[in-house]
């Protein structure tokens, strides 16, 4: 998964002395969630991997960051009941789920030269749900 991809991609990036690695974790990896210990642990592990890779690869011109989305309008959230969706939205200061484009825009930013001095960070894209 994530570890193998970093290993594979970083080899070429090291030769170029430039690269951007962007992992997609979850707010659950930051804050946890009752009943989802396995999912939360895997996403928290990805955050730890991101930070370690950032430290290992920075001297070679490679940044490594993670995006941690909250609720996003996808097939995964479409199956939730209206009651669950409304309760979730009450926990989000912006009062809505993210659009997939909101997550994509965060990735585009982290991949850009405007994020050249950002590494080892977790960018929460969650409408303020975790702060």
Per-region residue spans from a language model:
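Short, flexible catalytic-loop segment of classical short-chain dehydrogenase/reductase
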Residues: 47, 68-78
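C-terminal helical subdomain
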Residues: 66, 89-114, 118, 127
